[in-house]
Amino acid sequence: LEKKPIIGADLIEAYRVNGWWVVDKKGAHEVGDLVVYCEVDSWIPHTLAPFLTKPGHYPREYLGVEGERLRTVKLKGQLSQGLLLPLVEDNSEEGQDFSEILGITKWEDTRYMANMDARGNFPDFIPKTDQERVQNLDRTLEKYFGQSFEVTVKRDGSSLTAFVNGEESGVCSRNVNLKETEDSAIWAAANSLSLIPKILSTGRNLALQGELMSQKIQGNYEKVQGIEWNCFDIYDIDTQEYLLPKERRELCKQLRIPHIKVIDDAFVLCHNVDQLLEMAEGPGVNPGVKREGIVLKSNEAAFSFKAISNSYLLKHG
């Protein structure tokens, strides 16, 4: 744990955990302390932190639990992302996960998924589409300095995975395997792009993963007309490995599958967390749209992460 004063603030100061800055009461923690850090987009039960609910308001409810979602905020000009709590156990160790003990879950926007029929759970032979945030890799990045990375735009939509595994095929949202119904926008998008037939044409067991955007998803932040889907990953189910960026791009071109926008296909990593967060700022794909952030994937190894634009988080996150 590190800390620094906030100019013009007498009662609060900024504390740094890994790559995250959190504003808390002055003197609440000391340099080197072990604390429980709750990341942005955590759902914090009201019983754990009632002060997160605005005075005079009732707590919100998510998955049957009253509480609040942690968002990115600015206090006295200082970015604050997360919440610091005292240790739960005296014999706690660095890196220990207390989410289950404290009843903290990850918040996800379920409004768009409310009317979707699940065929089953997300397949256990495919990883879910989730990248680690760069702030959690503060001590890891140096291991990859000098390596070549692909840098792509991160778009604000909904995850779509189409797969073929032997006789089984399907289309999934971020968390579930979906039934093919007439009103399923995800299945409609997969069918319009012939994703499953295109996988079958390769003779391989693959999962195509990408971002689905439309006028009905996430308030159409990306300002798309109709439906757009961009592939950002291809997973080889037999080898249980993601294709490296170059092979993925080549296969997308061969199959005529729309690929996510590439900013740099040979970016040499030698940047710290703050520098990568600065890189996350910038234009998106469509005119007048700022990007949600960037995703970096090693051209040499199975290592990838995301850097989300702080200006995006302050306005939309």
Regions found by a protein language model. Name each.
Residues L1-G317:
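Core nucleotide-handling region used for phosphoryl-transfer chemistry
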